[in-house]
Amino acid sequence: MIPVNSLPERMERSNSVNKELNEDDIQRYKRHISLKEIGIPGQIKLKNSSVLFVGAGGLGSSSILYASAAGIGRIGIIDDDQVEKSNLQRQVIHNINELGKNKTDSAAKRILELNPNCDVKIFTERLNIKNVLQTIKDFDIVCDCSDNFGTRYLVNDACIILSKPLIFGSVQGFEGQLSVFNLNKNLSLIHISEPTRLTC
């Protein structure tokens, strides 16, 4: 586990303002603050950080909720889909009153109910080659919760160009994957290859 208080310094420069913790923050996040891996320095980094979530579906909805509850200062969400009844069984950020509404609007509403101090930026559109760099550029970290390979490779390419860490997650049935790319000059998604085949 990478302690939050050792994350890259660029996370503290989100929005070009270094926000300190106030009394409300100390009460809200006291369980975080009590952990040596986070503490007050780590919580300040979370407050001054920004994360873009690509997708507000099954994986994205849970990730967005936990990020907002943890104290991420600015959250971006890009998704062009609407809430359907069949989503509600797993996409826990949405509820029955949001049926037919944009997932981005539904997610933003729920974030602000959970943590009104979070700055939320929504993009109700599909991520594509024309908007990907502009969408990603102002966020510290990108969390890819999309459900198709075209978007995944597009996000990866943009993160390489912009030197952004990429959290890559996927879920199918009872299995899931989680990886971090482009952090501290490690591999990117496109550099993963099949394991070396052993020969006799």
Task: Label the model's feature ranges.
Residues 78-115:
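Glycine-rich phosphate-binding loop and adjoining beta1-alpha1-beta2 segment
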Residues 100-153:
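A structured beta-alpha segment of the ubiquitous adenosine-cofactor-binding alpha/beta core
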Residues 53-56, 77:
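Hydrophobic Val/Ile/Leu positions in short beta-strands of Rossmann-like dinucleotide-binding domains
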Residues 1-52, 85:
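N-terminal charged helix/coil linker that caps or initiates catalytic domains
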Residues 141-180:
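ADP-ribose/adenylate-binding Rossmann-like module
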Residues 69-74:
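Conserved S-adenosyl-L-methionine
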Residues 190-200:
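Single conserved hydrophobic/aromatic residue that forms the stacking wall/gate
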Residues 59:
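Hydrophobic/small residue at the entry helix of a nucleotide-binding pocket
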